[in-house]
Amino acid sequence: MARDYYEILGVSRDSSKEEIKRAYRRLARKYHPDVNKEPGAEERFKEINRAYEVLSDNELKARYDRFGEAGLSGAAAAASGFQDFAGMGGFADIFESFFTNFAGAGASYARSRQGPVRGDDLRFDLKLEFLEAIFGGEKQIRISHLEVCNVCGGSGAKPGTEVKTCPTCGGSGQVRRATRTPFGNFTQVSVCPTCGGSGQVLEEPCYNCNGEGLAQTTKKLRINIPAGVDSGTRLRVSGEGDAGRRGGPPGDLYVYLFVEPDPDFQRDGLTILSEVRVSYLQAILGAKVSVPTVDSKAGLEEEVELTIPAGSQPGTVLTLEGKGVPRIGNPMSRGDHQITLVVEIPTRISSEERELLMRLAELHGERINKRDGFLGGLLRGLAQMPGNREREEE
């Protein structure tokens, strides 16, 4: 009767994948034929490999937990009237075993497992103030990513120790197992459980990276923010992702920008939007008022003098050309700044002002309610203009 695989590795049934892996590595080093010359060590080593091959594979582990060794041979599935191919490693492995016999595809597969692997890309979310997005600049960020271990140089081996050819697969990175199916006998090709497909094993793993060849490192980066960016803009920083494995190139860092709102300005594409409050007399008679722009708020210039034409209506939009958002890649080309007039109607006036307004209303032949004073006639008309009616409702 076959021994229990969990018992072989000395782990419980609820052990994590990482715990199973650690137990396997510890036992594999202890009973490796190159290290342990005692009788029975080689058979024990094969037993350990078989146990790890099953328990490290989610599908095989699930079948073993449910049906035991019989579930791995297909007996449990056959009893239910059909053949389950989950334990065969998939049809890709079957086809691969065919081509291995005729075209040497197995060697190609092993080389792909042992070849360079590009590092993972990383994402970093960066908040910008409104004016930082408009004018750009430089931001310093701190990221954590994988870099080639500075102790072992990426080999994964402790300095002074060797990286040896895997004795299980002979350096090919793969193992073969004969499988019986309703279609006949097939040779299944799978990743070597000892070396994980690399074809090499460590005499002793590096203490800094635990044999991975890569170590987590925190570093500072300076990111150049182009003028005119907006929320959702993505910046690519080449080569600042995780380091590659086995000499592969590093991944990239993608910085996603999120722009915070501003109390004075809004943005619509390349257009800056704002409001300016003027009195009803300024709207009627015309005036010149100072208004802030994104440039003045950034300290690049003084506030701009805006001309209010006589007879301006509430909601009138005045435009400052070239005072908007710079175009990305061409900061000399800018959008406009559109300013909406908000006409303020006073709720209290002096008796002298009321007398003047009543005389003005009489000149225009306006009928006014004397009990309401200035709330009638001209001022009533101003108050009922669309832009100001909305503001009164607020």
Swiss-Prot record:
Q: In which residues is Zn(2+) 1 bound?
A: 149, 152, 206, 209
Keyword annotations for this protein, in alphabetical order, are: Chaperone, Cytoplasm, DNA replication, Metal-binding, Repeat, Stress response, Zinc, Zinc-finger
Residue ranges of domain J in the record: 4-68
Q: How is the cofactor bound?
A: Binds 2 Zn(2+) ions per monomer.
Per the record, the major location class is cytoplasm
Q: Which CDD domains match?
A: DnaJ, DnaJ_C, DnaJ_zf
CXXCXGXG motif repeat locations: 149-156, 166-173, 192-199, 206-213
Needed cofactors: Zn(2+)
Q: Where are the zinc fingers (CR-type)?
A: 136-218
Q: A cellular component term (GO) from this record?
A: cytoplasm
Q: GO molecular function terms here?
A: ATP binding; heat shock protein binding; unfolded protein binding; zinc ion binding
**Biological process terms in GO annotation:** chaperone cofactor-dependent protein refolding; DNA replication; protein refolding; response to heat
Q: Which SUPFAM superfamilies match?
A: Chaperone J-domain, DnaJ/Hsp40 cysteine-rich domain, HSP40/DnaJ peptide-binding domain
Q: Could you tell me which cysteines form disulfide bridges?
A: none
Compartments where found: Cytoplasm
The residues that hold Zn(2+) 2 are 166, 169, 192, 195
What's the domain remark here? The J domain is necessary and sufficient to stimulate DnaK ATPase activity. Zinc center 1 plays an important role in the autonomous, DnaK-independent chaperone activity of DnaJ. Zinc center 2 is essential for interaction with DnaK and for DnaJ activity.
Assembly notes: Homodimer.
Q: Which family does it belong to?
A: Belongs to the DnaJ family.
HAMAP family, sorted: DnaJ
Xref: PANTHER family: CHAPERONE PROTEIN DNAJ A6, CHLOROPLASTIC (PTHR43096:SF10), DNAJ HOMOLOG 1, MITOCHONDRIAL-RELATED (PTHR43096)
User: What job does the chain carry out?
Assistant: Participates actively in the response to hyperosmotic and heat shock by preventing the aggregation of stress-denatured proteins and by disaggregating proteins, also in an autonomous, DnaK-independent fashion. Unfolded proteins bind initially to DnaJ; upon interaction with the DnaJ-bound protein, DnaK hydrolyzes its bound ATP, resulting in the formation of a stable complex. GrpE releases ADP from DnaK; ATP binding to DnaK triggers the release of the substrate protein, thus completing the reaction cycle.
By what name is this protein known? Chaperone protein DnaJ
